[in-house]
């Protein structure tokens, strides 16, 4: 009986590790909001609030607003991850490959929740994976609300050209990232009257 209990506990621990990492396990707090007031509103039944108003710092040190980030994009995929999260690191190569296949009206952006504290490590992880897209390392406004409501990383949300959620988010690493992302991006594009991928 004792061996069965131990085996069951080990299996449960492995399952939790593969599914995602608790955000609180290694994340430091996101700085308080500045600039525009966060809306904190959900556009519909989706998991998290919209991210319509925020200022962010990118990995290269430049500043960007929500309006700048979403400009000209019908769909933005935002993958929130951490340098201390094994499932996040495991999916990074697949994220990098997927990002390179996207058309001009769709973008994949990453947000490293501990990137402001571990900038060099974040940059090295992305470089090793070959990720060439945009990476945020800190953000305020609506992004603060999003991060406060997230319980696990990786968490991926899908938003339209103004930061409204367009479909269900993904919590954890899907077994087939490209398929899961494509399904959600297609749904978002079709809802906007556009052709899918």
Residue spans of the language-model regions?
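Positively charged n-region of N-terminal signal peptides that target proteins for export
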Residues: 1-10
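C-terminal motif of bacterial Sec signal peptides marking the signal peptidase cleavage site
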Residues: 16-20
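N-proximal helix/coil linker or "cap" segments that precede and/or mark the start of modular domains
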Residues: 22-53, 70-72, 116-117, 123-124
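A short beta-strand-turn-helix
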Residues: 53-76, 100
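Short active-site neighborhood of thiol/selenol oxidoreductases, capturing the structured segment around
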Residues: 65-89, 108-109
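Structural microenvironment flanking redox-active thiols in thiol-disulfide oxidoreductases
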Residues: 89-129, 140-145
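Short, internal strand/loop/helix patches
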Residues: 123-162, 170
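Thiol-/selenol-based redox modules, centered on thioredoxin-like
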Residues: 158-197
């Amino acid at each position: 009986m004792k061996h069965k209990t131990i085996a069951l506990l080990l299996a449960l621990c492995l399952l939790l590790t593969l599914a995602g990492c608790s955000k609180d396990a290694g994340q430091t707090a996101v700085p308080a909001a500045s600039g525009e007031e966060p809306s904190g509103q959900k556009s519909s039944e989706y998991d998290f609030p919209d991210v319509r108003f925020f200022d962010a710092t990118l990995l290269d040190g430049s500043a960007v607003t929500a309006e700048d980030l979403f400009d000209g994009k019908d769909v933005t995929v935002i993958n929130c991850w951490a340098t201390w999260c094994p499932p996040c690191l495991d999916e990074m190569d697949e994220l990098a490959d997927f990002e390179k296949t996207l058309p001009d009206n769709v973008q994949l952006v990453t947000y490293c929740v501990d990137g402001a504290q571990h900038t060099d490590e974040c940059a090295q992880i992305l470089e090793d994976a070959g990720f060439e897209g945009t990476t945020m390392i800190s953000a305020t406004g609506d992004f603060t609300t999003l991060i406060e409501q997230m319980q696990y990383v990786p968490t991926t949300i899908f938003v339209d050209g103004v930061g409204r959620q367009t479909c269900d988010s993904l919590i954890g690493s899907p077994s087939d990232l490209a398929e899961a992302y494509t399904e959600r991006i297609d749904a978002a594009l079709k809802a906007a009257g556009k052709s899918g991928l």
